[in-house]
């Protein structure tokens, strides 16, 4: 390893050539092309993902789950055991945690529902007793003040300011975002063997080293007795089911020693049991003075937590732990106070408003399991901010680019907006098309991103994206093609969130069990995307992948307002939601 080599005599004899030119110069070619690793074998079906692992002495496993988080195992029809024996299958039951295993994966899959139907469960508590946005309003909350710079504080919450000046105009707005899935194209999986007191585990978790410590704690083993390999599976951009399935595979391998256990979640498992991005609500108030400058800005964010990653001493964050221990109580999350943490990420606007009132509300006892999903609270907060900015610019009768620039001191932000404006001017507006723009700087410290969208709305109230323009400033450009791929992929994901995605549930269970129940964007509504990358030579390199999400949601909403003449206040901007609001 590097560390071994660094201790040798040869290491200190290395001759490092003097760098004649600073790396922050124009001698770097930013336009090179990189071939995706293993792309040929992936396309040809030769490449092995974690799901494709094969070992001798291997058992395939599936978890048998109840309807929802609060179901207790009561009994099983004993006649099922003869069926299991005849088909060479094993059943593992510990309290309310149930798994089926066998050396023939197809037999395991075929038998899954048969065994599930033989089990009697008791519902300990309802999943929900009201519509989630009503619960957000009425449930208990931890409420904190957020100050400029993005940190949160346990201080007295100021009242919303009002003005008596008749020349001032005060507007209010509200924005709702539903629960969102990670929506990984493949379900989570893990493979584990426990042999001679040691684990060897394969996982596609984002947090391999942290997970190793957690498993050490969970199984009371020294970390040196756990080998945890990262192996590619479905990407997750946050906390999906990858950690849960790794824990479950390890648990089963400890019960069935000396055998590899390949555990795959089903599509229904992934959709119903992963931690979601929280439903959220934003409430805003702003006042324009006689010169159409914003002199007061109030923004409140309401949401469940964005952090329930398993950690040492917090094994209850594994979804199976509640069933292993028959512990169905809800655990109270603690509010995070660091700059631009979960709920209040990008709540602090980049604009130079004279006075701000920023408040985060961590709402307790909401129905669904939540954790980190790409951008955390920034998607909702940026969408709320930038749609409200558009409402204000319409009220002031000022061009949306000009109105934003009037409230900016940051020259990079101003340059970005002008770059987007230049891009959009080059392309003719399509027939019946409407345009919207939005911009932000992710976390007010990462990349700047501005998005323009053109869309049409059919007589059937179906939204079609026609064109999109992205301007991005990620500091000095090291790999232009990579930046373009990141922001264009992020645009498509955020457009899908904005127009289609929503986790549906009732009092008893999650209803979005498959792709029919959880709609995502399809190829026929992906617009022509044009991307401009501003190269800031000599400036720090900035993270870029998440910067586009909020501006995408807001630009779509802003184009829709121009098309419909009314602000649609709840995502997704689907035919159902638009019609419901317009018809009252």
Residue map of PLM features:
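Cofactor-binding beta-sheet edge motifs in enzyme active sites
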Residues: 1-584
